[in-house]
Every structure is written in C-alpha cells, then in structure tokens.
Amino acid sequence: GAGVIGWFAWDMPNPSTVLAQDNRQPAVTIVASDGASLMKVGDLYGLRVSLSDLPPYMPQALLATEDRRFYYHPGVDPIGVIRAIVSNLRAGGVREGGSTLTQQLAKNLFLSRERTLRRKVQEALLAFWLEARYGKDKILEIYLNRIYLGAGAYGVEAAMQRYFGRSAAEANPQQSAMLAGLLTAPSRFAPTTNLQRSQDRA
C-alpha cells in the first residue's frame, strides 16, 4: 500500500522544482575579429517551441516511432509492457523496453541512468505525476523541446537548425520523419555522421 509506494518514492527528486530550473549549458559561439559568427562549440538548445507552432506531421512522426498509444494510456501502458515482455522472451534477451513517451521524459528529466527495479518504479510514479499535472499535449511539447537528437542538439528546434538551417515550424514531412528516426540512436543516425543512413531511417 502507501508504505510500499513511500519506500520507492522517498528519494525521488521534487519534479516541480526540477522543471522550474534550467541547468542546460548553452553553446559557445566563436566569432571572428569583425564580429562574424564562425562556429558554435558545445551542446545546442533551440528556442522553446509550442505544439501549436509545429506542423502536425512532426509530433505525428515522433509518436509513430516512440509511442503510438500515447493518447490512450495514463503514463504507463500495460499493453506495451506485455508486448515488450513477449518480444523479449521470443528474442531471448532485451529487445524492447516497453516505456512510454511519458516514462522516457520522466527518466530524462528526473532520474539517473541506473537500471534497477527501484528506478523503474520511480519512473512509473513520475510518469503518472506528469500526466496528472500537465496532460498529454503539454507532455508532448516538453518532450519535443528536451529530447536529444544527436550532434549536440537538444529539442526539435535545435535539431532543425543544426541539420537543416531552418526552424522547426518550417519542417517538411521528410525532415520530420528524419528527426523521428534519430530517436533510437541519435549519434549513430545523425545526418552529420551518416546522411544516407539517416535518410534510410526516415
């Protein structure tokens, strides 16, 4: 009951406090003597975009890749968990994780990379909290602004600027599909690393 939940939750971070903070370090811009921008060094964080700013096929492409049932579960998807278990048993190893988009956001925002039962339960508890606090569209918006998409780019705006030199609001269907294809392995599939492989994933 409550005691079991308390045991799992006692050392969890305060999600409201974490979301209110922004500890992301901006890229450093190297400029020439005449003031012209030469290059950026470090991670790139784009301007925050709202869901309404984006063409609909961008979030659609992401959900088709990451969480097709996003709008039909409360943060944790029992059907996805069962499907992952069956797939892993058939494969004889871990092939699918069963985590929803909300769980991925909870893990990326609040938790360490530690892979234990305790962390998995905390991930689920935080996913339920996010769903209750923000709702689907806001969760998707936060995810789109925070997700790592390779080449030091965090968020769809930064990724669009890094790879295509345009804003996320100007993304076309192919570019949206290419960004969605980066989610599985951002560094491996980044267009800056292997353009053909990235296009094949789109």
Identify the residue ranges that each predicted region occupies.
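Flexible, acidic/glycine-enriched loop-and-adjacent beta/alpha segments
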Residues: 22, 50-101, 154-164, 171
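Short extracytoplasmic
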Residues: 21-53
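Conserved SET/PR-domain catalytic core that frames the SAM/AdoMet-binding pocket
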Residues: 32-36, 55, 59-60, 131, ...
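N-terminal post-signal-peptidase region of extra-cytosolic proteins
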Residues: 13-17, 42-51, 64-65, 124-125
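Non-catalytic, structured segments within soluble enzyme domains
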Residues: 93-202
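Acidic/histidine-rich, surface-exposed loop or edge segments in extracytoplasmic proteins
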Residues: 38-47, 63, 87, 184-187
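N-terminal type II signal-anchor transmembrane helix
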Residues: 1-31, 69, 89
